[in-house]
Structure formats: C-alpha cells, structure tokens
Amino acid sequence: MGKLENASWIHDSLMKYLNSTEEYLAYLCGPKRSDLSLPVSVVYALIFVVGVIGNLLVCLVIARHQTLKTPTNYYLFSLAVSDLLVLLLGMPLEVYELWHNYPFLFGPVGCYFKTALFETVCFASILSVTTVSIERYVAIVHPFRAKLESTRRRALRILSLVWSFSVVFSLPNTSIHGIKFQQFPNGSSVPGSATCTVTKPIWVYNFIIQATSFLFYILPMTLISVLYYLMGLRLKRDESLEADKVTVNIHRPSRKSVTKMLFVLVLVFAICWTPFHVDRLFFSFVDEWTESLAAVFNLIHVVSGVFFYLSSAVNPIIYNLLSRRFRAAFRNVVSPSCKWCHPQHRPQGPPAQKVIFLTECHLVELTEDAGPQFPCQSSIHNTQLTTVPCVEEVP
C-alpha cells in the first residue's frame, strides 16, 4: 500500500511539470541560467582582456625580435598560442552556457569542436610547461649537453609532437560526446532540450577522465617538482663552490632569480590546474548524487573554471615578464619611440681574469639579469679568458 501511495505522489508531481514544457525542462535539467552568471562573466571579461593582450604581446615580441627566437621561447610561443585558443574560442562558449545552459545551438559539429578544443589545449599547455621545465633542467645540470642539443629545429620537432599527441589524446573524450535530447514519458523529445554532453556509458567517460588526469596532470606535476628540486640542489651546490669575489658578484643575483622563477612556475602550475582536475575527478568518482554533493560539485566547477582561464592570463606574466629581455621587448613594441622607456646599455668592463666555469654561463642565461649576450668560457685558464657568445638565450 505504501509503495502505491509513493508512486501516486511521484505521478502527481510529474504531471504538474508536464503541464509546462519549461517547467519540465527545469525539472530535468535544472535552471536555464546559472545563479552566478553575472559575477562570473565579469571575472571572465577581465581575464579575457588581460590574457588576450598579454599573449598577443608574447607572440608579437618573439616574432619580431630575432634575438628572442630561441628554443625556450619557441615553447613559450606555443604556450601563448594555446592560451589564445582557450580565450578566443573556448571562453565565449563557456560564457554562453552560463547564460543559456540549454539548448545547445551549435549542433553536433559545435559539440565535437568544443570538446576537442578544450582537451587539446589543456594537454598542449601542460606538455609545453613540462617541456620547458625539462629544457631548463638540462641547461642547469647538463650544460654541455644543452649547448650541443638545444636548437630551434629540435624545439620545432618537439612542439610538433606535443600538439600531435594533444590532438590524438583529445579524441577519446571527444568521441563519447554528442547532442542529447530530453524525452517526455511517451518517448518524444522535449523541444529546446538539446545539450552537449556524454552520450556513451558513463563508465567510459569516468575511465577516460581518470586516465588523462593521471597522464596529463599527476605525472607532469610530479616530474616538474622533482626536476625543480634537483635544479635547486645543483644551484645550491654551485653556490658553495664559488671561488672568488668576481664569481660571487656575477651569480648571487642570478641564483636568486632562478630560485624565484622555479618557485613561481611550480606554484602557479599547481594552483591553476588543481581545481580543474579535482572537478573532473570528483564527477568521475561519484556514483550516487545527493543534493549536498551536487552543491559541492557546482562550487568546485565554478572555481575550477575561473582558475582554468586565469592560467591563460597569468602565463605571460609568469613566464615572460620576469625576464628583463622580454620587458625591454614589450616596451619596444608598445612604445618604440619612447626613448626614456628603454634602459641604456652599460659599458662593458675589461675581460675577466679569473676562472669561471662553463656551467655558470648557463645559470646566468636563465635569469632576468641576462643581457643580450654573456661570455662563456671556451677553456679554463688562469689568464685572460678566450670567450664566445652564448648561443642559447633563455629569457
């Protein structure tokens, strides 16, 4: 008897929603507009302006300045391109869905494009950051190897692989998405209910999300942390081997700059990408949803979206504006006729008379204090050094 009364109550509630298509859609899909649509849109607009201007400047200064066309800057150029794709193509779709959760008006092609875009740029960004970290590790710990192997042609080959892998690994998640319509109890489709969502069994989606989060977040984050830890140990060891006052004066600021940059790289990577992957993993591990779990997930989803786009806006600041050379290039692009905006070159002193190791040249190259060129020792003598210009210049 109790079951019959319960079934009757459900039937009465459902019939109430069936009297209005909009009410029935709200019953099935939730509100058509997010409660946070206005404040989130304002935040997104600020991120959009800062991110687009910053990343365009990065691409422009690298393309216009021959001295900035180095292997490391090629990776930063790739990172700026992926950030621009997110901001110019991904963010407008995100803002649209904040104001119109349904229907999805761009059809199956638009759904596939949206999913593939986000997956591809997500993977390409992380792989680019990881590649930069590996390059810097080699430059600091294995400078002779970096001198021989780190070339622009090699960087272009690696970037081709990065984007190819990103596209390939975006296909599984893209293939399980599509347009889904809600249905009335009689089996007919509800008008205006089209959404871009998972159309295959949910366990397939959960497996893909968990696998890609491991491959494209947990592993890179672990690798980057280990590499920066090893670089820190190497820099600390080199600090203890300083033999004279000249070497101390040259490398004390460089060590501080490198340490600060490494810390910022790891910190920003973790802060911006952790909420995004927590959001995906949270959804993939929950089997039975309750009202409280749904509220927590919605909050995480909003926060993860803000940090996801924020990473695209702060990358030009973190990876480029900490470099003195990039700052000078930015000033040159923004105000080429402004003479007082550009720092004057200091006159170079006489050649050093002390012993300076080859590894120290690469430490200088990684700092904001690096000028257009720094002398590298071609051989170790106690007399005047024979010098050659540094080939690879890291911003």
UniProtKB/Swiss-Prot annotation:
**One Pfam family matching this protein:** 7tm_1
Q: What InterPro entries does this protein's entry cite?
A: GPCR_Rhodpsn, GPCR_Rhodpsn_7TM, NeuromedU_rcpt, NeuromedU_rcpt_2, NMU-R2_C
For molecular function, the Gene Ontology terms on record are: GTP binding; intracellularly calcium-gated chloride channel activity; neuromedin U binding; neuromedin U receptor activity; neuropeptide receptor activity
- Keyword Disulfide bond part of the UniProt annotation: yes
- What's the protein's topology in the membrane? Multi-pass membrane protein
Q: Show the coiled coil region(s).
A: none
Subcellular location per UniProt equals: Cell membrane
Q: What Gene Ontology terms describe where this protein resides (cellular component)?
A: membrane; plasma membrane
Q: Which residues are glycosylated?
A: N6, N19, N186
Q: Please list the tissues where expression of this protein has been recorded.
A: Expressed primarily in brain tissues, more specifically in medulla and spinal cord. Widespread distribution in peripheral tissues.
Q: Which GO terms describe its biological process?
A: arachidonate secretion; grooming behavior; neuropeptide signaling pathway; phospholipase C-activating G protein-coupled receptor signaling pathway; reduction of food intake in response to dietary excess; response to pain
Q: Write out the function statement from the record.
A: Receptor for the neuromedin-U and neuromedin-S neuropeptides.
Membership in a protein family: Belongs to the G-protein coupled receptor 1 family.
Q: What is this protein called?
A: Neuromedin-U receptor 2
| Species | Mus musculus (Mouse)
Q: Which gene encodes it?
A: Nmur2
